[in-house]
Amino acid sequence: MRYITAGESHGPQLTTIIEGVPAGLPLVADDINEELARRQKGYGRGRRMQIETDQVQIVSGVRHGETLGSPIALVVENRDFAHWTKIMGAEPLTEQEEKEMKRKVTKPRPGHADLNGAIKYGHRDMRNVLERSSARETTVRVAAGAVAKKVLAELGIAVAGHVIEIGGVQAKETTYRSIEELKSITEASPVRCLDEEAGNQMIKAIDDAKSNGDSIGGIVEVIVEGMPIGVGSYVHYDRKLDAKLAAAMMSINAFKGVEIGIGFEAAHRPGSEVHDEIVWNEEHGYTRRTNNAGGLEGGMTTGMPIVVRGVMKPIPTLYKPLQSVDIDTKEPFTASIERSDSCAVPAASVVAEAVVAWELATAVIEQFGLDRMDLIRENIERHNEYARGF
């Protein structure tokens, strides 16, 4: 599977075209809208979420609630575009209109793509950069991820994300009986945290940051259960599944680090306390006593739950702006303020789910793929039976 997105933050709409989704996948707009609504929730979101109520329109590739195997086009309208029609319109402006335009951006914000992008593409108005580099684009990435999650769910593979740290407040390791219970607890938490006490402290940390005109980041974790053994490859560097997952997580706006399983903790332990011992039983076949590897070894799945974490830096748009330089005058200035969140870590956990689901669905279809969901399901069942008796 592959997809491409298009659209600007304050343009008329966001669009994604998805290719390679097998025929026969049950899919309706509500499957996607549910994920879009989850992305818009979370303590610390800004006023933009009060303006936009994201709803998807399925333009092609689905008929009567089932995918056709042809490209799927999804569109999400930007309701705020009504206030930006002149500024973000596609038609040329007159010289007078250009002079009157009040939203020209010449002061790059530290931590954003503004200055680097303006230099790269030669834009004197950095709105041309910030409109596309905005995290608003993750709306349609979540839409694409919703399709991927649907593919995985039909194959018995479940994906769930949650927040384990915000602003230095760390959640205690919390046990849960099933991934469905994990989902239930996190959906009830304003910060999508399993640890209620830590969640309340996270809320206070967000409030403190907001009152100071500042922002805070954190860490999200994505857990996936039900992946067959051996998905991915050890043969070439670019086919290793852990590498693809790491790249996907790092592609999320403001993410600055990724770890799989115990990750960087492995540097502090001897090998005997890192590697997962292999066991076999008649019911499940091969499994592991522990899951320090996070479900991935040698670029392939082990059959254990996949565990991926991502670090999100504080959002760089601040109401207490940092110093910058005006690219027209070269004079120092405090950076311009765009409407923003004080903390987007809870929402980022939903985006992380989406990108992880996409990579896993793509890998599953590549390995077991045909053009029909029923045949892919049969292939996985045969593979699992083979692996148990290997």
Curated annotation (Swiss-Prot):
Pfam families to which the protein is assigned, alphabetical: Chorismate_synt
EC numbers on record: 4.2.3.5
SUPFAM superfamilies registered for this protein in UniProt: Chorismate synthase, AroC
One GO BP annotation of this record: chorismate biosynthetic process
UniProtKB keywords: Amino-acid biosynthesis, Aromatic amino acid biosynthesis, FAD, Flavoprotein, FMN, Lyase, NADP
Cofactor annotation comment: Reduced FMN (FMNH(2)).
Stored CDD domains: Chorismate_synthase
Region (Disordered): 95-117
This protein's record includes keyword Cell division: no
Signal peptide coordinates: none
Cofactor: FMNH2
Residues holding FMN: R132, S133, S134, N253, A254, G298, K313, P314, I315, P316, T317, R339
Ligand binding (NADP(+)): R39, R45
Keyword NADP: yes
Catalytic reaction(s) noted: 5-O-(1-carboxyvinyl)-3-phosphoshikimate = chorismate + phosphate
Top-rank taxon: Bacteria
Pathway assigned to this chain's UniProt record: Metabolic intermediate biosynthesis; chorismate biosynthesis; chorismate from D-erythrose 4-phosphate and phosphoenolpyruvate: step 7/7
GO MF annotation list: chorismate synthase activity; FMN binding
Subunit structure: Homotetramer.
NCBIfam families linked to this entry: aroC, PRK05382.1
Known function: This reaction introduces a second double bond into the aromatic ring system.
Recorded family membership: Belongs to the chorismate synthase family.
Name assigned to this protein: Chorismate synthase 1
Species whose genome carries this gene: Bacillus cereus (strain ATCC 10987 / NRS 248)
Gene name tied to this protein: aroC1
